[in-house]
Curated annotation (Swiss-Prot):
Entry keywords, A to Z: Cell cycle, Cell division, Coiled coil, Cytoplasm, Cytoskeleton, Leucine-rich repeat, Mitosis, Repeat
Cellular component, GO annotation: centriole; cytoplasm
Family that this chain belongs to: Belongs to the LRRCC1 family.
Function: Required for the organization of the mitotic spindle. Maintains the structural integrity of centrosomes during mitosis.
GO biological process: cell division
LRR repeat intervals: 39-60, 61-82, 83-104, 105-126, 131-152
Region (Disordered): 310-338
Record-linked PANTHER family: LEUCINE-RICH REPEAT AND COILED-COIL DOMAIN-CONTAINING PROTEIN 1, NISCHARIN RELATED
UniProt name for this protein: Leucine-rich repeat and coiled-coil domain-containing protein 1
Pfam family, one: LRR_9
Positions with biased composition (Basic and acidic residues): 312-324
PROSITE patterns documented for this protein: LRR
Source superkingdom: Eukaryota
Length: 1026
């Protein structure tokens, strides 16, 4: 056996110029033991005892190097391999990454299952010069995020990084949030730990390297078993010719090999076709390999012809009795001779088919099928040429036989030779029939493979559609959540605006009450003035009638002054009580501050974040469950493959069972077609579901539009009521202006009457007393004026504070409007339905802004009213000053008026009559104004009650609509979850069916291979006996 292995190594060294070399599990201790050619493109040294990378400096064109499962502790000796694309150093003893500076074209690097804790060797690979895209570092000892990011930041083309796989990772993977940190600092990454940026698992199916397997069956038929170029069962390489017969072990020794060795060979062959060896650059190389294979086939045919001519013994060159050259037996013999090409082993081929089933891609399958179709006619031409050459050779042999028959005279052995020839003819006919059945079976297997690929395509399309539906559902939910947040914000703003409206109305009512109190005070002052005037008239009448009654009149005046003092004190007390009440009301009022607003916002945000986190956790749990199910399926598939490999040698059936298995496979095909129909119906149901969801969403949008229209209608009614209130306020102001004018006219007339009456006063003493009383009253009035000024200042301060508060609120509202505008700009990129909603929201915002402007105008009007009241107070002060001056003038003119008294007595009676008439008219107007004022107040109260009722009804409607929307959303979510569960069940059923089909095809293939082996063994034994 050792000699066989050595010969295989030498033969592989000799044939390394073809491009690929495989020395898997050969027990090599160093690469220097091999003689490698500089034109090699790929080397596979998996599962050896190599401890150092050396003796590959001269291989300039090397592109794929596999040194996995060795004892390498240091990366070195790769400085000259500038064309290297893939490097596999997994399952070694490496502790540090280094020596990769010269690998400019390196795209894939596998360093898994090592002892690496230092990645500083990746620093020289930074920049646009290097093309490293894939790094596998799982099952190592990397424990620093900073070091990892520092070494990988400059890898501009890095798209796939694996730090954890199948539960085996690095210490860095235990750090919380390491995935988010790596994705933020490495934006070029697309896949991290076999998951994309969104955390979804990615199936890492890569291109398989078995482009040349379609020619293996043809090589088995072309190379015969008795040629000196057979290949042993332990051979794995496909492109290497077999050693001579004297070097190979016997068939009995091969039969005696245990099952464990076969399993080991299978397991060792499976990783030889790892996906890391394949790139799209190998397509051209594979075509070159096909051409080389064609040349080798021609050489093999010529060698087999020469070997047949050389190996024909002289004893066999005897004529047949009653045989013809054109008979069926000779024709079958010639066909058999033309097909004598070195036989290939089936164990590695089976292993490669398993690997291709696991890692087969659609594009690759199409490419292989195209190659198969393009290469078949060329190989048929080769087959025809070889058959013609062999026929010519056989004719030469027959001529030699006839020449030898004349010389040879030994007829005793003719009967034995004839029997042997007949047996050979029968065996060749059986072989020809078996080959025809084998061709049919191979065609049928190709059809089954095509159907399986089509089913895989349908399955992948179903998965893609489900993923798209999930993405669409997630986007719709996200949009709904954003719209609900906007609606909540607008509702909060509406509530705030209503609260501000109520506050402004309360302030307006307070100002109106204050004005009423001032009017009442003025009325009381006027009454007092009327009483004073009546007392003065009485005094004048008493002076005219009786001069002696002056003392009594003085006493009466004193009593009246005492009453006035008491009234003034009462007024002071009332004013003080009202001031206290006003202050208490101001203190008890609750203003909506910025801190409270921010607290409410933070609470709402916390609630929404919690909801979002809960939803994310639920989706993550679902993803984990699906990943576990997928891993379980993979494990089951692997277990099934191992079981099938163990049963590989136990199956020994004949050609009769093939027909029954074909019938079963036909039934399975019919069953698969039914399943395909079911999957198509499933896809149709999913499309119907999507359409129903779209209709439901349109209905929801319509309901939202109706709600917005109702809001606009209510806002319009409120604006109409506010305009009516404005008109009434304007009418009240006009009436007040008329009232002030009438009061000014009455004051002028009363001053005239007061001057005329004072002329009657003759007595100086009485005037002195009156002056003293007037001075006292003047002091009291000045005190009252000072108190009124203080009140005015306090009102001004309160007004300023109210204006500041209003300005702050206006600024807050402006900031809110700016944020809303920004939200509008971000939402303009969405669908048409969302645009309609945004337009409605903009209309609502405009209405709110108009309301705010109206409120600001109302506040301005209130401020103007306060300014008017202040002006009125100033006018009253000026009038008081003018009256004081008039008093002084009256005192001076008193002496002159006494003389003119008798002449003006008649005028006084006429004036008194006119004054009475004016007073009656004024009182009538005042009554009418009061009645109108009461009516307006009642109307305002009714309007406020109606507004409150409308607000309550609108809120109820909004709550009912929101509850109905939430119930519909929950129903839709439940229905979607049910449909998704049904789809997953159907997908699982389809996968189980595909597994069954794969198992059946593998069993059929194994049966055929066993039968072909039995035929080959039988033919080889017959040849040995001959």
């Amino acid at each position: 056996m050792e000699a066989a292995v050595c010969s295989e190594i030498e033969r592989e060294d000799g044939d390394s110029s073809c491009g690929d070399v495989c020395f898997m599990d050969k027990g090599l201790h160093s690469i220097s033991e091999l003689s490698l050619d500089s034109s090699i493109h790929a080397i596979n040294l998996h599962c050896n005892n190599i401890s150092k990378i050396s003796s590959i400096d001269h291989i300039w064109n090397l592109r794929h190097l596999d040194l996995s499962s060795n004892q390498i502790s240091q990366i070195e000796g790769l400085n000259t391999l500038t064309k290297l694309c893939t490097l596999n150093l997994s399952c070694n003893l490496i502790t540090r990454v280094e020596g990769l500076e010269a690998l400019v074209n390196l795209t894939k690097l596998n360093l898994s299952y090592n002892h690496i804790n230092d990645l500083s060797g990746l620093m020289p690979l930074h920049g646009l010069k290097y093309k490293l895209r894939y790094i596998d570092l799982h099952s190592n000892y990397i424990d620093s995020i900073h070091h990892l990011l520092q070494c990988t930041v400059g890898l501009h083309f890095l798209t796939n990084l694996i730090l954890e796989k199948d539960g085996e990772g690095n210490p860095i993977c235990l750090i919380p949030g390491y995935r988010a940190i790596i994705l933020q600092t490495l934006p070029q990454l697309r896949i991290l730990d076999c998951k994309n940026i969104f955390g979804e698992p990615v199936s890492l199916e890569e291109i398989n390297s078995s482009h040349l397997q379609c020619l293996e069956g043809l090589l088995d038929n072309l190379v015969s078993s008795d040629s000196p170029l057979n290949i042993s069962e332990d051979e794995v390489n496909d492109d290497v010719p077999a050693p001579p017969m004297d070097v190979l072990p016997s068939l009995k020794e091969f039969k005696s090999t245990p099952e464990d060795n076969v399993l080991a060979s299978l397991l060792s062959v499976c990783p030889s076709s790892e996906p890391e060896k394949i790139n799209q650059e190998n397509d051209f190389q594979n075509e070159v390999k096909l051409q080389k294979l064609d040349d080798q086939i021609l050489q093999l045919l010529n060698e087999t012809n020469n070997s047949l001519i050389d190996n024909v013994p002289e004893k066999d060159l005897r004529p047949k009795r009653d045989t013809d050259i054109t008979s069926e037996s000779d024709y079958g013999n010639r066909r058999e001779c033309s097909r004598k090409v070195p036989r290939r082993t089936k164990i590695p081929y089976y292993a490669r088919t398993i690997q291709t089933i696991k890692h087969h891609n659609k594009n690759n399958g199409a490419f292989v099928s195209c190659n198969r179709k393009m290469r078949q006619p060329y190989l048929r031409d080769l087959y025809v040429r070889s058959s013609l050459v062999n026929c010519n050779n056989l004719r030469d042999l027959d001529e030699q036989k006839t020449g030898v028959i004349k010389v040879d005279k030994n007829f005793s052995d003719n009967s034995t030779y004839r029997s042997l020839v007949e047996q050979l003819d029968q065996e060749r006919e059986m072989r020809w029939k078996a080959e025809q059945t084998e061709k049919k079976l191979m065609d049928y297997i190709d059809e089954l493979h095509k159907q399986a690929d089509e089913k895989k395509d349908v399955h992948s399309q179903a998965l893609i559609t489900t993923d798209r539906l999930k993405d669409a559902i997630f986007k719709e939910r996200h949009c709904k959540a954003q719209l609900e947040i906007i609606v909540h914000r607008l509702q909060n703003e509406v509530k705030k605006l209503t609260i501000e409206l109520m506050k402004a109305r309360d302030q307006q009512e307070d100002h109106i009450r204050h004005l009423r109190t001032l009017e009442r005070a003025l009325e009381k002052m006027e009454k007092q003035k009327a009483q004073q005037q009546a007392a003065q008239i009485r005094l004048i009448q008493e002076v005219e009638l009786k001069a002696s009654a002056a003392d009594r009149e003085i006493n009466l005046l004193r009593t009246s002054l005492h009453q006035e003092k008491q009234q003034v004190q009462q007024l002071h007390e009332l004013l003080a009580l009202k001031e206290q009440e006003h202050r208490q009301e101001i203190e008890t009022r609750q203003f909506f501050t910025d801190a409270e607003f921010q607290d409410a916002l933070t609470k709402r945000l916390c609630k929404e974040e919690r909801k979002h986190e809960q939803e994310v956790k639920e989706y993550q749990e679902k993803i984990d469950i699906l990943n576990q199910q997928y891993l379980d399926l993979e494990n089951e598939f692997r277990i099934a493959l191992t079981v099938e490999a163990r049963r590989f040698k136990d199956v020994q059936d004949g050609f009769e069972d093939v027909a029954t298995e074909l019938a079963k496979s036909k039934h399975a095909l019919i069953w698969a077609q039914r399943k395909e129909n079911e999957s198509s119906s499933l896809i149709k149901d999913l499309t119907c579901m999507v359409k129903e969801q779209k209709t439901k969403l349109s209905e929801v949008c319509k309901l939202k539009q109706e709600a917005a229209a109702n809001l606009q209608n209510q806002i319009n009614t409120l604006e109409i009521l506010i305009e009516d209130d404005k008109q009434k306020s304007i009418q009240i102001e006009l009436l007040k202006h008329e009232k002030t004018q009438l009061i000014s006219e009455l004051a002028a007339k009363e001053s005239l009457i007061y001057g005329l009456r004072t002329e009657r006063k003759v007595w100086g003493q009485e005037l002195a007393c009156q002056s003293s009383t007037l001075s006292q009253s003047r002091g009291k009035l000045e005190a009252q004026i000072e108190s009124l000024c203080r009140e005015n200042e306090s009102l001004r301060k309160s007004h300023e504070s109210d204006c500041d508060a209003l300005r702050i609120k206006c600024k807050i509202i402006e900031d809110q409007n700016e944020t809303i505008r920004k939200l509008k700009d971000s939402l303009q990129e969405k669908d048409g339905q969302i645009k309609l909603l945004q337009e409605q929201i903009a209309l609502i915002e405009k209405c709110s802004q108009e309301q705010l402007n109206e409120k600001s105008s109302q506040l301005d009007s209130i401020v103007e009213k306060l300014e008017r009241h202040n002006e009125r107070k100033e006018k009253l002060k000026q009038q008081l000053k003018a009256k004081e001056l008039e008093l002084e003038e009256i005192r001076k003119a008193y002496s002159t008026l006494n003389k003119k008294w008798h002449d003006k007595g008649e005028l006084l009676s006429h004036l008194e009559m006119q004054v009475k008439e004016v007073k009656e008219k004024f009182e009538d107007k005042e009554r009418k104004l009061k009645a109108e004022r009461d009516k307006s107040l009642e109307l305002q109260k009714d309007a406020m009650e109606k507004l409150q009722n409308m607000d309550d009804a609108f809120r109820r409607q909004v709550d009912e609509i929101v509850e109905a929307h939430q119930a519909e959303i929950m129903q839709l979510a439940n229905e979607k979850q049910k449909y998704i569960d049904c789809a997953n069940l159907k997908v699982q059923q389809v996968e189980d069916e595909m597994r069954g089909l794969l198992d059946e095809t593998c069993k059929n293939k194994k049966m055929m291979e066993e039968k072909i082996k039995q035929l080959a063994c039988a033919i080889s034994e017959i040849q040995k006996e001959m």
